[in-house]
Amino acid sequence: MGQPVVVDSNIIIKEMQEGRSLHPIAKRIKKHKSKMVIPESVLGEVQKVTGNEADVIMDTIYEYCKYPVTMDKTDEINAESDRLVEQYYKCHYPDSLILATAKITGSALVSFDRELLQTAKLEGVQAFLPRNFVRWW
């Protein structure tokens, strides 16, 4: 099995609003026999922005990925998130939780947020813009 991949909320939001962003990522994950990881904080953020309930959001994800892994916050993820907020001036909640989830689970991270991607790289987490993930991962 390949490396898991954490998908940021901005990918799912863009998919729900415009389409086209999640499908190529899901195809790449499937090709590598990997898992798409959806942190609890991502679901919350997507709900807040789109106004959709969690089941509607998950239905959108299920269209392209049959078995995503939803990840609850753990004490370890919360502690890592707090450390990231303290260490990096530009790393805020909920981005810190998303990055902490990727780091603790050994996952790659896909996001449109360049500051989050930069912080991820400083933390040793593989991080990609969607187009680069589809092209190079």
Model-derived features: where do they sit?
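Short, well-structured N-terminal submotif of metal-dependent ribonuclease cores
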Residues: M1-I38, V49-D59
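Acidic, PIN/NYN-like endoribonuclease modules and their adjacent C-terminal/linker elements
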Residues: M1-V7, I104-W137
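Alpha-helix/helix-capping structural signal
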Residues: N10-I11, S41, R114-E115
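Short, structured coil segments at secondary-structure junctions
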Residues: H32, Y64-C65, E123
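A short acidic, often aromatic-flanked loop/helix-cap motif at beta-alpha or helix-coil junctions
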Residues: E45, K73-A79, N132-W137
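Helix-adjacent hinge/juxtasegments
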Residues: D55-I61, Y67-T74
